[in-house]
Amino acid sequence: MQKSYLLNTIGFLFSLLFCLPSFAAQTEAPLPDTFAEHKIVLQISDSDPFKQTLVLNVAGNLQRYYGADNVDIEVVAFGPGVRLMFDGNTNSQRINTLMDSGIRFSACQNTINHMAKKLGYTPKIQKNVGIVPAGAGRILQLNAAGWQILKP
């Protein structure tokens, strides 16, 4: 009886060992394919309109400074910063213009879920904004892949 229990336990542990990496891979957003010399992730976690405008200014300024072909930029929003990416936000047109120039925008699914509970409805996120499982996790994922983090 003990031998059977031990074998089942070992089998279960080995199955976990091989399954967990596939579960972890499913929770992370894929890394962008980039050959840019500079890779920058901008964090916005504040609902202050001044800081939200600042992060958009920095994104555009960095792209102009390095040149669109030489820099890859992703703006990641979590916490109150997700409001920047709400559909109909006063910066929606500006975000569209920056996206058209190649800058990516990502919003935190955890924050959206939390806001939905508080608001009683799921807030609509601007079209073409990527949704990532966790905004802070996305920033760390990009940093581990060599991206520089800026929090203007």
Per-region residue spans from a language model:
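A subset of signal/propeptide-processing and intrinsically disordered low-complexity segments
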Residues: 3, 21-23
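Bacterial N-terminal signal peptides
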Residues: 9-21
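Hydrophobic alpha-helical segments with strong N-terminal bias
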Residues: 5, 17, 27-30
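Secreted/extracellular ectodomain signature
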Residues: 24-152
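Bacterial N-terminal signal peptides that target proteins for export
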Residues: 1-10
